[in-house]
Amino acid sequence: MNVIDCISIIVIIISAVISFFRGFLQELSSIFIWIVGVCVFFRYYSFFSIFSTYVRNIFLKNIISYIVFFVFFLFFKSIFDYCIIIFIEKCGISLINKIFGMFFGIIRGVLFLCIVLFFLELLTNFAYNKYFKNSFFVPYFNCFIKVVIKYLFKKYILFKS
């Protein structure tokens, strides 16, 4: 094992520990809320900039609308997370939630490493590094990346009408 493998293991362990303490339902709801928030933001951000009538500069007006939306979004997310915590405590599924959260964290850590590795290979000469070539985990990550890219290419590029 070399440096890349050690970093990979550390990232996966940190992700698993964080997800263990947060729990599966909170992790899942967090991802769902972030996706919905980003979609709503890109669809309606111009609507929020209308409320900034005191600012004449369009760029500054958009920045203010981004900040206002982000603050409201974080407020809504914290309320939703609190409701999920209460639900978990009332149902008594805390241990199962934490165990599934740990597995979710492992998967999230592997996906994060695959994304980072993909962009390192795409944008840099990192693939020619001796640590990269001698890594134990990199071939497995690359295999997963190739499967995902092949699937996405077939699904969204070749059959797009």
UniProtKB/Swiss-Prot annotation:
Compartments, as annotated in UniProt: Cell membrane
Task: Give the highest taxon in the source lineage.
Answer: Bacteria
User: What keywords were assigned to this record?
Assistant: Cell membrane, Membrane, Transmembrane, Transmembrane helix
Entry's Gene Ontology cellular component terms: plasma membrane
Q: Which InterPro entries match?
A: Colicin-V_CvpA, CvpA-like
- Does the UniProt entry include the keyword Transmembrane helix? yes
List the membrane topology term(s): Multi-pass membrane protein
Annotated membrane-spanning segments are 7-26, 31-53, 66-88, 101-123, 136-153
Q: Name one GO biological process term.
A: toxin biosynthetic process
Q: Which family, according to UniProt?
A: To E.coli CvpA.
The protein's name is: Colicin V production protein homolog
What is the species of this protein? Buchnera aphidicola subsp. Baizongia pistaciae (strain Bp)
